[in-house]
């Protein structure tokens, strides 16, 4: 015969358990089991974990997850505490920083709240960087701007400090971006028009961290965070057979940029009838294997899609591209309407002589470039002269400049008349000029639409392609990725999973 027992549970036992505190006091009863022993010594926090704990004033024995209410959003923290001071002075992101789920979101979390310490390049990372540079040099002949800058610095070193400041006005960042706009936008866009592809093209966009949307109009640029990136390869698909042979192009030849851009636009418009745009990313591997983790593969796909979308958005019209490029300069605290110092102007001309010389001469004469946003923005220089007349002669005389030019180009450009550059310029060279020409170059892609993206895996030792993974360009997939990135960077919401 069975017996039935009745129990009465006290009311306090029916209450929901209190949430655990975010420290080890809640686990005090377990301390005897968890305490270090001779067999089980204590594990100190890793250097990165220790940085996070120090930021929030917590001891080495504290749990690593500080209370969420004490955390500023990751992007705010990233631009206030960063091993690279430029991100604090010029808040921005890279495309790779948007790939928050490529390995583990918590790893990104600790990276940011550890103050984004600068990493010492590993041997494998250096190998990959060198490999990318070799691919670029094979496709695009160019002069290293640092070697030209070194020669310019030698000349400036013999001048008084006040004179140097005048000749380098705008600063080193303005010089760097101007060179990048010429080499990695203007020249690369022309290369695609003539050869069907280009490597290492600079692209950028703006991500609204509140809505998770990428800017697509002038009215939404100001609401977004600047995101920069370098696309490993932009190409036409299928490759235009015989296109490069029918239209030989020497990037060192002297170009009339106005007609050159008009001709390139006409060719690209014709090609758009039976070609599409493809962006590729090159991943280097030490061995003949490729990543198997789906999150890593998807991140590489998303990276290419960001580049493709940036290019498509910039190419929609010249005025949008111009405003977007001007905003990129402005976010770096550079006034695009202020002249670049003559020393910087000379260095840029030596580095990219064939591309820039005819435009330099047009500016010196006061000619318009037939690009309304730029022409309107710079007309005041024609009627209202700057404090000192702008001229390359303020830096060096023409014979000295020609000697410098010959050191890098031989006698290739010896017959080009540049005398007007050493007289008073009617329109000083400004960052706005580089934005204008880059905008016109990006407009070449107006009618070309992305249909696919591709990730190439290369063996860094043999130089061979191990595998190519192609994906259709899908705006919905990209929108999901950008919203996920904005949610993490703008508000910090993570899955807390290793994916």
Swiss-Prot record:
Its main location: mitochondrion. GO terms for molecular function: 4 iron, 4 sulfur cluster binding; DNA binding; metal ion binding; single-stranded DNA 5'-3' DNA exonuclease activity. Residues 1-27 are annotated as: Disordered. Its EC number is 3.1.-.-. GO terms for cellular component: mitochondrion; nucleus. Coiled coil: none annotated. Residues 1-12 form a transit peptide. It is found in: Mitochondrion. Keywords: 4Fe-4S, DNA-binding, Exonuclease, Hydrolase, Iron, Iron-sulfur, Magnesium, Metal-binding, Mitochondrion, Nuclease, Transit peptide. The keyword Membrane does not apply. Its cofactor is Mg(2+); [4Fe-4S] cluster. GO terms for biological process: interstrand cross-link repair. Binds 1 [4Fe-4S] cluster. InterPro entries: EXOV (IPR019190). Disulfide bonds: none annotated. Single strand DNA specific 5'exonuclease involved in mitochondrial DNA replication and recombination. Releases dinucleotides as main products of catalysis. Has the capacity to slide across 5'double-stranded DNA or 5'RNA sequences and resumes cutting two nucleotides downstream of the double-stranded-to-single-stranded junction or RNA-to-DNA junction, respectively. PANTHER family: EXONUCLEASE V (PTHR14464:SF4). Monomer. Belongs to the EXO5 family. This is Exonuclease V, mitochondrial.
């Amino acid at each position: 015969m069975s017996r039935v027992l009745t129990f009465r549970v006290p009311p306090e036992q029916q209450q929901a358990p209190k949430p655990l505190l975010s420290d080890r006091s809640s686990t005090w009863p377990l301390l005897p089991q968890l305490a270090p022993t001779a067999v089980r010594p204590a594990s100190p926090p890793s250097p990165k974990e220790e940085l996070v704990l120090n930021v929030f004033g917590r001891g080495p024995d504290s749990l690593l997850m500080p209370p969420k209410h004490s955390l500023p959003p990751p992007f705010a923290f990233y631009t206030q505490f960063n091993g690279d001071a430029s991100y604090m002075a010029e808040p921005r992101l890279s495309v790779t920083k948007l790939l928050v789920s490529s390995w583990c979101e918590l790893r990104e979390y600790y990276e940011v709240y550890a103050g984004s310490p600068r990493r010492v390049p590993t041997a494998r990372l250096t190998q990959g960087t060198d490999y990318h540079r070799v691919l670029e040099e094979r496709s695009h002949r160019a002069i290293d701007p640092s070697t030209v800058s070194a020669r310019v610095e030698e000349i400036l070193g013999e001048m008084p400090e006040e004179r140097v400041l005048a000749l380098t006005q705008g600063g080193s960042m303005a010089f760097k971006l101007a060179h990048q706009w010429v080499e990695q936008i203007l020249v690369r866009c022309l290369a695609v028009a003539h050869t069907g592809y280009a490597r290492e093209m600079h692209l950028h966009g703006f991500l609204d961290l509140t809505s998770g949307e990428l800017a697509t109009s002038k009215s939404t640029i100001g609401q977004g965070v600047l995101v920069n990136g370098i696309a490993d390869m932009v190409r036409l698909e299928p490759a235009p057979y015989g296109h490069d042979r029918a239209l030989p192009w020497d990037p060192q030849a002297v170009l009339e940029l106005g007609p050159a851009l008009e001709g390139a636009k006409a060719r690209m418009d014709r090609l758009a009838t039976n070609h599409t745009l493809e962006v590729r990313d090159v991943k280097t591997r030490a061995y003949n294997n490729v990543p198997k983790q789906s999150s890593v593969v998807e991140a590489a796909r998303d990276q290419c899609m960001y580049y493709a979308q940036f290019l498509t958005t910039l190419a929609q019209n010249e005025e949008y591209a111009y405003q977007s490029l001007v905003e990129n300069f402005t976010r770096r605290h550079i006034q695009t309407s202020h002249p670049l110092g003559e020393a910087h102007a000379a260095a840029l001309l030596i580095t990219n002589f064939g591309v820039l010389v005819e435009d330099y001469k047009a500016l010196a004469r006061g000619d318009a470039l037939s690009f309304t946003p730029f022409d309107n923005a710079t007309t005041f220089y024609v009627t209202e002269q700057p404090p000192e007349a702008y001229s390359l002669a303020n830096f060096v005389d023409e014979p000295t400049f020609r000697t410098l030019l010959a050191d890098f180009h031989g006698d290739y450009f010896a017959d080009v008349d540049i005398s007007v550059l050493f007289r008073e310029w009617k329109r000083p060279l400004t960052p706005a000029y580089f934005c204008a020409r880059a905008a016109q170059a990006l407009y070449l892609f107006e009618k070309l639409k992305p249909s696919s993206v591709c990730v190439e895996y290369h063996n860094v030792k043999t130089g061979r392609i191990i595998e190519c993974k192609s994906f259709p360009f899908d705006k919905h997939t990209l929108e999901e990725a950008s919203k996920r990135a904005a949610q993490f960077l703008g508000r910090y919401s993570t899955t807390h999973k290793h994916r």
